[in-house]
């Protein structure tokens, strides 16, 4: 029996499955877009934005619902009746226009035979004055406008999130590039250590230290590569797309203005406009509660057909025209409580608006300080990187000349790796801070030159 062949055959199938599954994940489709293409796709496909669009459309339909209370109502009704009730029986025959002399016989009046009636009616009612309907229409228009402003703010948020994701992707790509440099340099250090050991100029322990340093650099590269993939997948999720999304260009550089310009722009931020409308609607809600004190005036009319034998029959027909006034003189103090409640709600909305404006002002101030901090830290990290590069170069020269031990070179390399990572992070923080300030002031679409 060929045990070797059997072992290979047993291993072959699992290895094929592993290879197919592995390549399926490794070569999953990756979309490649420009930054502006990514923003455009996000504005079209993002699920949160689609939900907000549906909410805005639903609010717009609410205007039609409110307007319908001011329009005429037309009602068609077909009703069947069979009765021996004396009053109903007599009036039904009267509606059918078939009253005869014997129907006035007391015995017939008191004990009528069963009467059938198919009643067909078409009625119309038109409000002439309805205070609640008028105020409700104004409020529904305001609510629709507020939802539209919220939708535009949501678009700004999505654009901001795409810019954030793009900057994050750029940062982790730079970090991955730095780890690749670190691996290449660690490989070179190991080569030098092995050469020196082979020539009897170094110790075997130096090669072990260099190999350990290489392993650590490779681990950092693996983590950095994972971060790149996660950033791409996160961007794909934000864009509402399957798989990873990579960008083939950089995020546009946003201009940095004076803080006064950002504070001025924030006064017309979309969510501020929305809350201003909500606050105005809350005040109108007081008028809506007070509308209960006003009468409801309307006119109406109806055309009716009655037949003892068939639906839609017209053995007897009649019409009527009405004008009416309905006035709730007392409703158990319900209107008073509704009015008081509406006043408190209006005060709540006004306080929410004031809080939002102050919060925005604080965030703009904070974001501006963060920019100054990030810019200073970026400059410091750039100088630190230059120092680390020069320091490592000098240590390597001295190590190759036998003046420094390997541990000094590895320490210098570790400092350089840290300086690279720190500078990459500080650059990302600076650009992220500018994008955040643009978003907080409500001008990110303008800065990115994107039409809402």
List PLM regions with ranges.
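Acidic, low-complexity, intrinsically disordered peripheral segments
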Residues: 27, 82-87, 422-452
């Amino acid at each position: 029996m060929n045990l070797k062949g059997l072992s290979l055959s047993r291993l072959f199938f699992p290895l094929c499955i592993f290879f197919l599954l592995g390549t399926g994940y490794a070569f999953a489709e990756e979309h490649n877009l420009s930054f502006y293409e990514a923003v455009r796709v996000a504005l079209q496909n993002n699920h949160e934005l689609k939900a907000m669009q549906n909410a805005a459309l639903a609010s717009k339909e609410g205007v039609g619902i409110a307007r319908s209370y001011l329009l005429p109502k037309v009602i068609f009704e077909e009703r069947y009746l069979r009765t021996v009730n004396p009053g109903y029986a007599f009036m039904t025959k009267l509606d059918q226009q078939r009253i005869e002399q014997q129907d006035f016989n007391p015995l017939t009046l008191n004990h009528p035979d069963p009467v059938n009636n198919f009643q067909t009616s078409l009625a119309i009612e038109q409000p002439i004055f309805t205070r609640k309907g008028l105020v409700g229409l104004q409020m529904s228009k305001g609510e629709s406008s507020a939802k539209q402003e919220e939708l535009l703010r949501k678009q700004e948020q999505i654009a901001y999130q795409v810019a954030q994701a793009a900057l994050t992707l750029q940062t982790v790509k730079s970090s991955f590039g730095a780890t690749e440099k670190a691996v290449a340099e660690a490989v070179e250090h190991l080569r030098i250590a092995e050469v020196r050991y082979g020539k009897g100029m170094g110790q075997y322990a130096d090669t072990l230290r260099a190999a350990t340093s290489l392993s650590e650099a490779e681990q950092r590269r693996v983590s950095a590569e994972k971060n790149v993939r996660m950033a791409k997948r996160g961007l794909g999720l934000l864009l509402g797309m399957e798989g990873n999304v990579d960008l083939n260009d950089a995020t546009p550089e946003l201009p940095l203005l004076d803080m006064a310009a950002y504070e001025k722009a924030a006064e017309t931020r979309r969510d501020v406009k929305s809350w201003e409308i909500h606050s105005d609607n809350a005040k109108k809600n007081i008028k809506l509660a007070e509308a209960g004190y006003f009468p409801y005036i309307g006119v109406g009319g109806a055309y009716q057909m009655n037949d003892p034998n068939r639906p839609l029959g017209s053995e007897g027909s009649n019409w009527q025209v009405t004008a009416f006034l309905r006035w709730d003189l007392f409703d158990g103090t319900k209107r008073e409580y509704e009015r008081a409640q509406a006043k408190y709600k209006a005060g709540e909305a006004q306080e929410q608006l004031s809080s939002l404006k102050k919060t925005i002002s604080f965030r703009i101030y904070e974001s501006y300080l963060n920019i100054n901090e990030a810019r200073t830290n970026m400059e410091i990290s750039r100088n630190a990187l230059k120092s680390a590069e020069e320091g490592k170069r000098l240590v390597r020269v001295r190590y190759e000349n036998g003046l420094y031990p390997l541990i000094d070179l590895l320490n210098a390399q570790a400092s350089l790796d840290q300086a690279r990572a720190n500078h990459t992070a500080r650059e990302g923080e600076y650009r992220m801070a500018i994008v955040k300030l643009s978003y907080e002031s409500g001008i990110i679409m303008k800065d990115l030159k994107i039409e809402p």
